[in-house]
Amino acid sequence: QRQMCIRDSSYGKDRKAVIDEGKCVGCGRCIGHCNFDAIRNNNFDAGELLNRKMAEYTKAVLAGRPGFHINMVIDIIPSCDCCPTNDAPNRPDIGMFASFDPVALDEACVDACNRQQPLPDSQLADNMAAEGFCDHHDHFTNNSPETDWRTCLEHAEKIGVGTRRYELVRVR
């Protein structure tokens, strides 16, 4: 069984999931680990606020500068790569994507990931096979319901960083 929290801040008590706010650092691993949406972070706005701020900082960094963006969609792991521990990749390597528009680029990468089947024995495959699983038709949400990637791209598009519309051109 996978460890639910690296800081032991989430645990079961009286058959209910509990988060010890004193130990919690807000990484969201417990939320991603829970297949049944039984754990909710008290600061439920934090992820949405972070996503909006990332879009705003991106706009500031790119303002008045030319940009060409490259994403390598490989080793797609369940949690952010900033987490000190993680699980095996949950989707096959997809490839390299590039664009002058960072929003279109990220949207294309998300769509490509969602078209893939989860790798067998991955955290995502385990989540989706669990009894009572609620399919959100989005692998990122299925893996970590508390993490909503859409808010970042929606806000980035709204403030003029780019557009979520794209045309995929394969280069071999």
Stretches with model-predicted labels:
Residues 3, 7-172:
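Extended, low-polarity segments enriched in aliphatic/aromatic residues
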